[in-house]
Amino acid sequence: MDRLPLELPSSLRQEFKSPFGPVYTDVTQFLTDAGRPIIAVGDIVTYHLQTVDYTPAVAVIDGQTKRESVDETVKAALSKHNKRIDVENQPGTISIALLEALQTAVETPESVMIVVDGEEDLATLPAVLVARPGGTVVYGQPDQGMVRIAVTPETKITMSRLLKRMDGDAAAAFDRLGVDRSGDKK
């Protein structure tokens, strides 16, 4: 039986403190450098992309930034996606629902907003695993900017290794995402 959700053990928390890629404060420069499609994780990152009229292929939001509710301007801007998937995902975990929503979203031709009841902070990890090589996953680094992760075999391996170290059934998570243990599509 699956032991999901996966939980982030305290021994692994430090590895998520440093950015997994270059940090940007200029959205236009980020878009110049980013491969497509783009998966955005975080309300403020998604909002900043939309302020320059760019809608990411997939956005994962939870209505919060730095553990506080986002303001009404951000909420209003984030309501403009073609399709919405609502999921539950508790803080410090990666739920079955989040994994399945990411898998569905990357296969959907129109933009998809995954709205998380709980916390989306760890969604970056499975987002890289399901993303198309050459694409980009972007997430917010508090008080620094937006972090660009180029989706490459190397970044998939990095995220795969982190996922394997989480508490729970990592093999079941890989299966739900439709990827093998190295992060490659099955």
UniProtKB/Swiss-Prot annotation:
Could you tell me what reaction this enzyme catalyses?
Answer: 3'-dephospho-CoA + GTP = GDP + CoA + H(+)
Where, in this chain's numbering, is GTP bound? 43-45, 62, 120, 143
According to its UniProt record, in which pathway does this protein act?
Answer: Cofactor biosynthesis; coenzyme A biosynthesis
Q: Which GO terms describe its molecular function?
A: GTP binding; kinase activity
Entry EC number(s):
2.7.1.237
Q: Does the keyword Nucleotide-binding apply?
A: yes
Q: Which UniProt keywords apply?
A: Coenzyme A biosynthesis, GTP-binding, Kinase, Nucleotide-binding, Transferase
Q: Which GO terms describe its biological process?
A: coenzyme A biosynthetic process
Q: What does this protein do?
A: Catalyzes the GTP-dependent phosphorylation of the 3'-hydroxyl group of dephosphocoenzyme A to form coenzyme A (CoA).
Q: Which family does it belong to?
A: Belongs to the GTP-dependent DPCK family.
Question: PANTHER family, from UniProt?
Answer: GTP-DEPENDENT DEPHOSPHO-COA KINASE (PTHR40732:SF1), UPF0218 PROTEIN TK1697 (PTHR40732)
Q: What is this protein called?
A: GTP-dependent dephospho-CoA kinase
